[in-house]
Design a protein with these regions (language model features):
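Second-shell loop/turn segments in exported
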Residues: 35-45, 73-75, 172-174, 210-220, ...
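Noncatalytic luminal/extracellular "stalk/propeptide" segments of secretory-pathway proteins
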Residues: 38-128
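Bacterial Sec-dependent N-terminal signal peptides
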Residues: 1-22
Length: 381
C-alpha cells in the first residue's frame, strides 16, 4: 500500500511539473485563438492585433527587435467578411459554415465545378450558389489583382429543398486593396554571430461573418507558442548561437509573409546554421514529421534529430520527407538549411474549422518534442 501511494504521488508530482512546463505555451495558444483575435486575418485587423500581442511578448521577454517595433511590414490585396451574414432559401435561414460557406475566388466557380454541381443559380449581382455533397475546406482570401471574381456560395445538398423558389443572400464582403500586414521579428544575441532561426506563422483563416470564428489553435497558434517558448528559454541566459525568431502573417494565403521575408532579408543567410519552422505542434501521438529532411544540406540535421530520438524515445515515429511548398520554411530553403517540423496524430481540435480550439490542443508530448528541437539547436536547459 505504501509503495502504491508513493507511486501515485510520483505520478501526480511529475504530471504537475509537466503541466507547469507547458503553462506558458497553453496561455499563448489560448490568447492567440481567442475571439479577440478575430481568427488572425484581415477582418477587424485580427492579424495586426495578434502581431501587436506577439511583439509585446517579445519585448517583455527581453528579445531584441530585428526591425523597428519588431515589425516587418508588407501588403497584399485581400477580402474580409465582417458583420452578420445571412442566406435564406424559401424563407428558411441556413446555418453558416455547417450548411454553407462563402468563397469570393474564381476557383470555386470554375466551369468544371459548375458543371459538376447538383444545383446552381447565379444571382443578379453575379454571385454563384452551387449545391455540393461536401463543403470545401475553408481558407482566407487573397488576390493579386483587383477584384474580378464572382462570389461563390457552396451549399450542402442536404440543406437544399427539392424546389428552390426564392433565395435571399446578404453577404457583406469587403475588398481590401494593399492591406497592411506584418511579420514579427526579434533576436537574442549569442556568443557568436552564427544564427539559428526559428519560424512559425501566426495568421489563420479569420472569420466568416461575426458568428463564425476560426480560432486556429493547432494551426498555428501552437507553433507560434513553441517559438515564443524557445525565445523565453534562450532569453534567460546568453546562448552560444545567436537566436532569431520570425513569426509570419500570410501563410494561409500562399506563404506570403515568409516569401517577403526571404526576398527582403533581415539577416545574412550565409551566417544561418539552420532554420527550423514549426507548424501545427499539438497532439503528436504518432510522432514527428520533418520536411526537407533529405537534401544534402539538411540530412545531417535529420540524422542528428534521429539520434536524439533514439536516446530519448520521445517520438513514436520520426518521418523524413522531401521539400515541399507546404509551410514557411520553403522560401528560405533556397538560401540556407531549412526544415519544417510538425506533429503527427491526435489530440487536436480540428483543421481550418471552428473546432480548432485551445481546449482541443493536446500538449502531452510538447515538452519532449521541444527538448529534441532545443538539443538540435545546441540549446541546453
Amino acid at each position: 500500500m505504501k509503495k502504491t501511494l508513493l507511486l501515485l504521488f510520483a505520478i501526480a508530482f511529475f504530471a504537475h511539473l509537466h503541466a507547469q512546463d507547458s503553462a506558458y505555451v497553453r496561455q499563448i495558444i489560448k490568447d492567440l485563438s481567442s475571439k479577440e483575435m478575430y481568427g488572425r486575418f484581415a477582418s477587424y485587423h485580427g492579424d495586426s492585433i495578434a502581431a501587436a500581442y506577439l511583439a509585446g511578448e517579445m519585448k517583455r521577454l527581453g528579445v531584441l527587435p530585428l526591425q523597428v517595433d519588431y515589425f516587418q511590414n508588407y501588403t497584399y490585396n485581400c477580402y474580409s467578411l465582417e458583420g452578420n451574414i445571412s442566406l435564406k432559401i424559401n424563407g428558411v435561414e441556413l446555418e453558416p459554415y455547417t450548411q454553407y460557406r462563402v468563397y469570393p475566388t474564381a476557383r470555386h466557380a470554375t466551369p468544371s465545378k459548375l458543371n459538376k454541381a447538383s444545383w446552381k443559380k447565379q444571382l443578379k449581382d453575379g454571385t454563384w450558389l452551387i449545391g455540393v455533397s461536401q463543403l470545401d475546406t475553408y481558407s482566407p482570401w487573397v488576390v493579386d489583382k483587383e477584384r474580378t471574381d464572382p462570389i461563390c456560395i457552396e451549399i450542402l445538398e442536404t440543406a437544399l429543398p427539392k424546389k428552390v423558389k426564392k433565395v435571399v443572400a446578404d453577404i457583406p464582403i469587403q475588398y481590401r486593396d494593399n492591406y497592411l500586414t506584418r511579420n514579427v521579428v526579434g533576436y537574442v544575441p549569442g556568443v557568436v554571430d552564427t544564427m539559428i532561426v526559428f519560424t512559425a506563422h501566426y495568421d489563420h483563416c479569420g472569420i466568416m461573418g461575426d458568428n463564425v470564428l476560426f480560432p486556429g489553435a493547432h494551426d498555428n497558434a501552437s507553433g507560434t507558442a513553441a517559438v515564443m517558448d524557445i525565445a523565453r528559454i534562450v532569453s534567460q541566459s546568453q546562448p552560444y548561437y545567436t537566436m532569431v525568431f520570425m513569426l509570419f502573417s500570410g501563410e494561409e494565403c500562399g506563404l506570403r509573409g515568409s516569401k517577403y521575408a526571404a526576398e527582403n532579408p533581415l539577416v545574412d543567410f550565409n551566417k544561418v546554421k539552420l532554420l527550423c519552422n514549426i507548424d501545427m505542434f499539438c497532439g503528436g501521438d504518432e510522432g514527428l514529421m520533418v520536411f526537407n529532411a533529405n537534401s544534402t544540406e539538411t540530412k545531417p540535421y535529420f540524422e542528428q534529430l534521429k539520434a536524439i530520438n533514439e536516446k530519448s524515445h520521445a517520438a513514436l515515429n520520426l518521418r523524413p520527407r522531401d521539400n515541399s511548398p507546404n509551410s514557411d520554411h520553403f522560401w528560405f530553403s533556397n538560401y540556407c538549411p531549412s526544415i519544417f517540423i510538425l506533429t503527427m496524430g491526435q489530440p487536436y481540435g480540428g483543421y481550418h474549422d471552428p473546432n480548432d480550439t485551445c481546449e482541443g490542443c493536446g500538449l502531452g508530448h510538447y515538452n519532449d518534442y521541444l527538448k529534441m528541437i532545443l538539443q538540435l539547436a545546441g540549446i541546453e536547459q
